[in-house]
Amino acid sequence: MDYLEKLQVLIEEGQSANFLSLWEEYCFNDVVRGRELVEILEKVKSSSLASLFGKIVDTVVPLWEKIPEGKDKDRVLQLILDLQTSNSQMFFDIATEYVNKKYSGEENFNEALRVVGLRDGRDFQFSLSRFDFLMHMHKGNFVFHQGGWGVGEVMGVSFLQQKVLIEFEGIMSAKDISFETAFKSLTPLSGDHFLSRRFGDPDGFEAFAKENPIEVVEILLRDLGPKTAKEIKDELVDLVIPEADWNRWWQSAKTKIKKGTRIISPDNPKEPYVLSDAGCSHMGQLERKLGLSLNSAEKISLIYHFIRDLHSELKNIEIRKSLVKALQDLDVEEGNKSLILQRELLLSEYLGIKDASIDKEYITSLSEDDTSRLLENMPIVALQKSFLSLVRKYSSFWQQVFMQILLYTTSPTMRDFVYKTIKNDPSSVEVLKKRLLDSAHQPMMFPELFVWFFLKLGNHEDGLFDPEDKEVLRLFLESALNFMYQVASTPHKELGKKLHHYLVGQRYLAVRQMIEGASLPFLKELLLLSTKCPQFSSSDLNVLQSLAEVVQPTLKKHKSNVEEENVLWSTSESFSRMKAKLQSLVGKEMVDNAKEIEDARSLGDLRENSEYKFALEKRARLQEEIRVLSEEINRARILTKDLVFTDKVGVGCKVTLKGDAGEVVEYTILGPWDADPDSCILSLQSKLAQNMLGKKLNDVVILQGKEYKISRIQSIWEEHGA
């Protein structure tokens, strides 16, 4: 730990005695670093040690004298005068010499001396920083208000009244501010400061930003410090770059940042972009990250992404050698076969270092279980593909391995890869067809595989089945509807929504193509299945009915009374509850999801960004849930007392059933939002409720194979005594 770090720790902890002791030691340094001394003094100034240090601040003067001329030397002197409390002749002489040398002959020079206390020398603490501030107070210069008014432009100054007139970006009218208040709340900004350019010349800065994206980000980081991608967007979007152009502009900027060396990119969206003062080579940045990494798996990931994103760097022989050495020097446990394999794959497949450890003999020595375990512990998809290519080339059981991945992987990229490999092997085609047809007969066995292949088949991208074979298409379509019905209330319900989105997309194009020339029995079954799928709205069902009628006009005679079923009955309590749920989805969850997407997008490389993909999938789910719920609310009708009739069984009725042995069962029939089977409240759409609808007193109802007579029909309002 160097002096700066040690002193900062002591300042933060308020250890005055230890600080003064270490400071005394620091003062004996032969070499003084101006930037380091500035940081120490600024830390002291903002701490509880400021008044104590002010009594010995004269010890800084010899250090100040050793600093070369420049900004750091001027800043150290300002801080000395800010901290001093003695107002001694030595400090007075140093201060007056400084202002005479820097500002003599400037307008209002003598008035400024009087304002800061350098005319009479009685109290001139803060004199230099305040004098610099007053010399900055010229019309057209810029300041920043620390109290929330933002950037301001100086419109006028009066030394007689000791006031300055400033127009702020966040205030409607210009403000008169006294010098005393200005000293405490305003910070001067140079003309080339990011905030000055953004406020003073927005059109010119926008044009500059569009032509020079990386330079603008550098200016922002230089003047405002390290920023995350989200914070960079907050500073630029609409204020510099129009929101409509933001995504394209930011993607371009990130690409250039990645190729450049002045800005160090973060490893995840929550970390900031940092401007490197001296610039750091790509290899230097990688070496820094490798030095901070705590485990070999993370180091392998860093090296892989370096090779992938900056492949042109490999033309440099020294860089290639450094990467090889970094991989060979990795501390990998002998038993960690997966990490060893990943390292060897990077060396052989990406860096051209052929190693005998992953030759034909090694691949053939692996069992099927060994191969699966190695893949499970290999997070980088590209390395998985490289390994599988070797398995395909040398292993006798490659088909089994590839088929298992096809069935169980959650990565669409990997599923596409193994599917194409199997499909391109003539001896495996029939096995592949059989497996996919099995998935159509039992889609719940491998739900993700079924949905993935159904979409591929519907788009004629499978390259396996004859696109003219409508029977295969219809088999999968029928299975898709069964699947949608089965998954509606399971953890796989999002897959059902995905199928629904596909089937109704492009004006039901997939459905129209699949049912072309279909038989009447098939279409009847299709329409029946569609009514069981909760994902389909009433308008969807109407469209499906119309599409089927185009293929088989006789279906018009069998047209179900969809219009009568269109109403969704609800109690007023459930209606209010569902409206509140919709408002929560639209007002909170969608906003939170938008933030998740932006945070995940911010790194720019979306190819293997799982967080970004998950956030997009969540957005699609939320949008679909909002669409379905909005449609249901539009169809909803609140059940009232005058709408319930007890001459026959209908919605809003409580039905008493009596068996042959005298046993009594009671059911209440309400809409789907109010259904509660545990309390014997049936949904109007349930099979049992449908069997009872329209029946009258003494009519027979079959329940679990037994006959029951309807002994009583009453309104739910009679039950409540209303």
Swiss-Prot record:
GO terms for biological process: DNA-templated transcription elongation; regulation of DNA-templated transcription elongation. Residues 1-504 form the GRAD1 domain. Keywords: Coiled coil, DNA-binding, Transcription, Transcription regulation. Residues 565-722 are annotated as: GREA. Gene3D superfamilies: Transcription elongation factor, GreA/GreB, C-terminal domain, Transcription elongation factor, GreA/GreB, N-terminal domain. Residues 606-643 form a coiled coil. PANTHER family: TRANSCRIPTION ELONGATION FACTOR GREA (PTHR30437:SF4). Necessary for efficient RNA polymerase transcription elongation past template-encoded arresting sites. The arresting sites in DNA have the property of trapping a certain fraction of elongating RNA polymerases that pass through, resulting in locked ternary complexes. Cleavage of the nascent transcript by cleavage factors such as GreA or GreB allows the resumption of elongation from the new 3'terminus. GreA releases sequences of 2 to 3 nucleotides. This is Transcription elongation factor GreA.
